[in-house]
């Protein structure tokens, strides 16, 4: 059951990434049609923009992310239990030892960052270290180490980059349509039914693509959380420790320090504790659903 869940989550992620590239091609074709009457040219430009966005974000420094979250690097002497658990989980996962950081905050939480295992880091809040026993802490750190081993940060970064590129192209295409599109449309002989259909299709794509991209990005993030939960159990062989940790995280207060939206997606549990309609656009699946999946293992 465990390995079936891991395989299923990986398949869903790849399916969603294909959907992302299809969306990028769609918005590129729509913008290309409106700008230069060349859908193929628009697709090529869209993929170049998406590639630039992805490369730029992937190589963002780990230190920058840690600094944004107020994390400080600690040694084995400063945080021996946390350090040894990270060391043990990295050894079982067969990845290099990540750097270890602590965030001064009473709310229990943790996150990992780094585009590959060689430059990765794991951070835990002081609240997490106080609240969790060793088995629960192993579950949380196993989750974060699994994100590193599974290259989740890179996949999530690509998803964010593609969503940003789609939103940017859509925004620029919309402005071009209103401020210069009329002249372009008059320059083309688009009075035919096909031309009108293409125009309507392009407008719909420009309007709806950013929303669709956001939903796909969130779906990818949720699948990677399920995968990290299952992978943590693979490392620790202790589903109950992970379940208890998630339940404690679910009952905790929001983090006291400010966490921006991009960083919030990295944490094991929503640091802002969103409610109401905001949950529709949350990067994490409900903890109750995560616990239910772990219980089925």
UniProtKB/Swiss-Prot annotation:
Signals that turn on the gene: Expression is maximal during the early to mid-log stage of growth and decreases after. Does not respond to heat shock up to 43 degrees Celsius. Part of the lemA-htpX operon.
Disruption phenotype: No effect on extracellular glucosyltransferase activity, nor on growth characteristics. Deletion does however alter cell surface appearance, making cells rougher at 41.5 degrees Celsius. They are also slightly less adhesive on hydroxyapatite.
Listed Pfam families: Peptidase_M48
Subcellular location: Cell membrane
Cofactor note text: Binds 1 zinc ion per subunit.
Binding site residues for Zn(2+): 143, 147, 225
Top class in the EC scheme: hydrolase
Cofactor entry: Zn(2+)
Main location: membrane
Any single GO CC term annotated in Swiss-Prot or TrEMBL for this entry: plasma membrane
An example Gene Ontology biological process: proteolysis
Gene Ontology MF, one: metalloendopeptidase activity
Sorted UniProt keywords: Cell membrane, Hydrolase, Membrane, Metal-binding, Metalloprotease, Protease, Transmembrane, Transmembrane helix, Zinc
Bilayer topology term: Multi-pass membrane protein
EC code(s) of this entry: 3.4.24.-
Residues annotated as the enzyme's active site: 144
InterPro entries: HtpX_protease (IPR050083), Pept_M48_protease_HtpX (IPR022919), Peptidase_M48 (IPR001915)
Transmembrane segments: 14-34, 39-59, 158-178, 196-216
HAMAP family to which the protein is assigned, alphabetical: Pept_M48_protease_HtpX
The name this protein goes by in its record: Protease HtpX homolog
